[in-house]
Every structure is written in structure tokens, then in C-alpha cells.
């Protein structure tokens, strides 16, 4: 389906009726996102059995409440696996609720940072207060995005707009994430906060978010580690005057786009990463097989290091698909290295036969393509009609340095 929207500025404050801001002082930061009117909310969370206190708290709040007004998030501390962590999570929510003059059960929360250390509430509280004081600043969206960064190299934000019967609907988002990215969020450290002014029910929003997440955040891999804190929220406040039932396909497509763009920004910012990898597997027997194979490619450390060195070692791609669990016939599949625009494509394997070898034009073309900062790996399994695209990044020396020094 053709995209029926345009990209606009503003991130989470692009939709009508939303304010936001953030503040960070060296290691610790806090962000606030606020709807001026009642909103419905949906959330998806990490499936890690070791999960942070704000994850537990917000899961419960989402189940037991139908009206929401705000999201509060802190960086620098994960608030996970500590005595008193739930007390700290509730205190963070209470601080935001008091400042915004709304009930505590209308606030969702999230944290990111080091696991196993008690939250420095005296510092975090000050950061929340600073974020609240300047929620009308022109650069408030960027401030909120920067405030939740940890090892991120750049803030991640996107917004889109589409028109229905003369009225505009907007969806905006911010995210953080660079390491510990291999989410599996069902019902993604990675945080994503999305706002929209569509009129939609809680059930419809939850369903739409789950579908968007499965095609975006759950297809993103930096290092294969699933965080204890992965969370994505959507707030919808109905201020556009457009009902979801009048634009279901348009809204779902726009939400999926926002989610995918945020996911791609996250993997592009993988700790020390220089290159974005998009791995598309088509011709799979089932959707599950397509996902298994594409995720296996972007998760492979050998493939990641090959991309880092611009080495078109197609055997690593074939091996990753082979051990993924997807059905395949090694005598009949294709492997292609392409630029992101699909204008330049190098066949490495065709119908199970090696095309690229030392000195061949195909191998030389693949080497040149792999020097670019965005590359696409295409595998045709020739087993069926299903496909999936996963997102990953290269892996180099800087990743080891960052993670060997993280808690110090």
C-alpha cells in the first residue's frame, strides 16, 4: 500500500494537545510528555524474566486504568533488581503527577541505565522539576529525546501527518537505544514514546501498537541482548477530531512507519556502529520462517564484523540462514548485497550456485556497496510467499570499548 502521509517536524509535540520537555545534567536525566486532555494509552514491554520496577508498575497501571495524561522517564539508572526499587518507581510517578496536577494512576513511567543500583532520587527529582519548568520551549521535543539518552550518540525523533476528510492526524515519537537491543515485546536498553491525536479506543490502540511493534522494534538487533527495561508507549488524545474507524489502514500504516523509523535510528546508533543493515528474507514458507532467517542474519556476530570490514563474506549469510530454523533448500536460494535504494545489486549466490568469487565483478561490486553506511542483504528462499525485514548494525572496536567501561 502506498504511503498516505508526510513527514513533519515536532516529534511527540507534533500532535495536537501534547507538551514535552527534558533535562539532563551529565549522567542523569528526566523527560516528561504530557497531554493537555484525557488520553488512552497502550504499552508493550520486555519479555525478560528479570524486569525493572517501572515495567512492573506500568503494566499494572495500564491494566487497571483507562485514562492517562503523562509519561515520565529517567536515564542513568535502570531501577532494576534493587531493594526499594518499587518505592522509587512510585516516587518518580508521584513527583510527575504532583507537578502536572493529575492523579498518579494517569502517569506511565520508564527508566534506563545501570542495573542493580538504587535510584538517586534526590538527583532524579531535580531533573524532573527542571523538565517541568520549560515544557513550552520550541526545542522541547529534542530536549525530551536527549534527556533519556545513555550511550546514544544522537537523539531519535520522527513525526508524520495524514489527512482524512479535511482534518489532519499526526503521530510523533522519540526513542532511545544503542546497546542491549534484541527486544521481544508482546502486549522493546530500548525506550519508545509515541503520541497521536487520533480518536481511538484502548483496545484498538493496543492492537495497532502490537502490530507495529512486531514489524519494527521486534525486528531490531544491535548486540542480541534483551534489556530488562524495554518499553514502548503510545498516548492518543482524540484532539484531531478524526476517528480511528474512519482511517484504520492509514493510521496503522503511519504508526508502523514511525515505529520502523525509530527502530532504524536505534540500530544505526548501535554502540560504535557505523553502518545500518537491512536484511530482507522473502520466498519463505511461513512468516515465522521469514522472521527467523532475517533476524538470524542481523544477529550474527560474524556477519556484523564482516559488514564492519566491508567484506562480502556471503558464507556467513548462508550459515546464519541455515541455522535459523527456517525451512530452506541449499540447492535453490539467492543471496544479494544491495545499496539501500536497490539501484546497485550484487548477486553472490543464485539458485544455490556461487556467483561471486575472488576477482569477479559481482564480488567487487559487493565490496563497494558494503563501504556505504546503509546496506541491504536480500535472501530469496524460494519456498513460499512470505517475507520479513530485520534491522541491525555492524560491530567494531568501539562497541567493546564502550561496554567494557560502562559502569565506570
Swiss-Prot record:
The terms describing its cellular component in GO are:
cytoplasm
Which residues constitute the catalytic centre?
Answer: 189 (nucleophile)
Cellular localisation = Cytoplasm
Q: What is its EC number?
A: 2.3.1.35
**UniProt entry tagged with the keyword Zinc-finger:** no
Which key words are in the record?
A: Acyltransferase, Amino-acid biosynthesis, Arginine biosynthesis, Autocatalytic cleavage, Cytoplasm, Transferase
- Record's protein name: Glutamate N-acetyltransferase
Source organism: Methanococcus maripaludis (strain C6 / ATCC BAA-1332)
Upper lineage ranks?
Archaea, Methanobacteriati, Methanobacteriota, Methanomada group, Methanococci
Amino acid at each position: 500500500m502506498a504511503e498516505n502521509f508526510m513527514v513533519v517536524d515536532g516529534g511527540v509535540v507534533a500532535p495536537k494537545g501534547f507538551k514535552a520537555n527534558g533535562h539532563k545534567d551529565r549522567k542523569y536525566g528526566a523527560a516528561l510528555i504530557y497531554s493537555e486532555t484525557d488520553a488512552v494509552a497502550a504499552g508493550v514491554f520486555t519479555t525478560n524474566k528479570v524486569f525493572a520496577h517501572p515495567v512492573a508498575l506500568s503494566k499494572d497501571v495500564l491494566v487497571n486504568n483507562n485514562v492517562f495524561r503523562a509519561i515520565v522517564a529517567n536515564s542513568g539508572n535502570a531501577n532494576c533488581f534493587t531493594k526499594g526499587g518499587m518505592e522509587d518507581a512510585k516516587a518518580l510517578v508521584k513527583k510527575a503527577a504532583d507537578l502536572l496536577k493529575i492523579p498518579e494512576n494517569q502517569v506511565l513511567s520508564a527508566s534506563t541505565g545501570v542495573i542493580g543500583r538504587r535510584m538517586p532520587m534526590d538527583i532524579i527529582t531535580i531533573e524532573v522539576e527542571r523538565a517541568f519548568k520549560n515544557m513550552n520551549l520550541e526545542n522541547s521535543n529534542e530536549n525530551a529525546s536527549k534527556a533519556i539518552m545513555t550511550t546514544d550518540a544522537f537523539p531519535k525523533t520522527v513525526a508524520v501527518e495524514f489527512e482524512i476528510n479535511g482534518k489532519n492526524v499526526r503521530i510523533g515519537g522519540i526513542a532511545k537505544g544503542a546497546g542491549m537491543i534484541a527486544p521481544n515485546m508482546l502486549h522493546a536498553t530500548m525506550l519508545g514514546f509515541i503520541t497521536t491525536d487520533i480518536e481511538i479506543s484502548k483496545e484498538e490502540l493496543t492492537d495497532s501498537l502490537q502490530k507495529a511493534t512486531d514489524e519494527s522494534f521486534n525486528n531490531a538487533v544491535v548486540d542480541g541482548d534483551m534489556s530488562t527495561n524495554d518499553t514502548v508507549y503510545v498516548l492518543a488524545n482524540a484532539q484531531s477530531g478524526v476517528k480511528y474507524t474512519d482511517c484504520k489502514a492509514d493510521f496503522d500504516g503511519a504508526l508502523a512507519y514511525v515505529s520502523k523509523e525509530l527502530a532504524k535510528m536505534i540500530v544505526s546508533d548501535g554502540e560504535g556502529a557505523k553502518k545500518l543493515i537491512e536484511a530482507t528474507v522473502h520466498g519463505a514458507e511461513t512468516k515465522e520462517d521469514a522472521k527467523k532467517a532475517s533476524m538470524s542474519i542481523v544477529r550474527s556476530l560474524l556477519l556484523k564484523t564482516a559488514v564492519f570490514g566491508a567484506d562480502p563474506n556471503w558464507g556467513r549469510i548462508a550459515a546464519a540462514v541455515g541455522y535459523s530454523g527456517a525451512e530452506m533448500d541449499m540447492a535453490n536460494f539467492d543471496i544479494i548485497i544491495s545499496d539501500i535504494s536497490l539501484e546497485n545489486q550484487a548477486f553472490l549466490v543464485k539458485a544455490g550456485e556461487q556467483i561471486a568469487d575472488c576477482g569477479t565483478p559481482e564480488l567487487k561490486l559487493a565490496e563497494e556497496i558494503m563501504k556505504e553506511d546503509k546496506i541491504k542483504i536480500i535472501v530469496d528462499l524460494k519456498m513460499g510467499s512470505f517475507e520479513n525485514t530485520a534491522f541491525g548494525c555492524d560491530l567494531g572496536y568501539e562497541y567493546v570499548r564502550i561496554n567494557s567501561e560502562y559502569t565506570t
